[in-house]
């Protein structure tokens, strides 16, 4: 963090966008429903190219796990997304709490065990623990910052999706035909 005391948020713009969004949602409640989409394609080994809107992303694994290290791992993108989401919500709601944000940083860490996918006894591969360490520099009172962070955390779809079970559906097409998946038994029972 630097010593330069500059509010990184356009407070007036933030208040205007908030008011406009509330007005739109009040008059058209269905406009609050949103779908986001990412499309990914395996290039070679663990190297994957993804597209999210107009943006191109690359993902890979470390050499020790069969990759060529041409990009962050999928889970690194996942936790970076969680950090981006929380900071976006803090920036979005800072004007409502009169919290100038001179500097904000989120350090997100996720702990998990890979044993299960390699046929070893262990947890199911889900994150065991996720920690958001948020560092804020602001001239606002501590109570204002606390309220802002609590609001941002509740408004962060990534944090809420990590907290609550979310139904996941996987659809597979093999050579143009649907291929039903049957989830039975241990992960590696067929290897």
What does each model-identified segment do?
Residues 1-79, 92-191:
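Extended beta-strand/beta-hairpin segments
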């Amino acid at each position: 963090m630097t010593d330069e005391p500059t509010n990184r948020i356009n407070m007036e713009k933030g208040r205007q966008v908030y008011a406009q969004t509330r007005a739109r949602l009040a008059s058209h409640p269905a406009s609050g429903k949103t779908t986001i989409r990412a499309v990914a394609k395996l290039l070679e080994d663990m190297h994957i190219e993804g597209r999210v809107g107009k943006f191109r992303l690359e993902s890979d694994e470390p050499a020790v796990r069969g990759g060529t290290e041409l990009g962050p791992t999928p889970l690194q993108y996942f936790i970076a997304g969680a950090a981006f989401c929380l900071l976006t919500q803090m920036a979005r709601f800072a004007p409502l709490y009169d919290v100038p944000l001179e500097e904000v940083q989120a350090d997100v860490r996720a702990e998990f065990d890979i044993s299960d996918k390699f046929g070893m006894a262990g947890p199911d591969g889900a994150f065991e623990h996720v920690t958001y360490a948020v560092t804020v520099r602001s001239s606002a009172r501590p109570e204002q910052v606390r309220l802002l962070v609590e609001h941002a955390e509740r408004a962060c779809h990534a944090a809420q999706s990590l907290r609550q079970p979310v139904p996941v559906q996987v659809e597979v097409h093999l050579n143009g035909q649907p291929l039903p998946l049957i989830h039975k038994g241990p992960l590696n029972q067929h290897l």
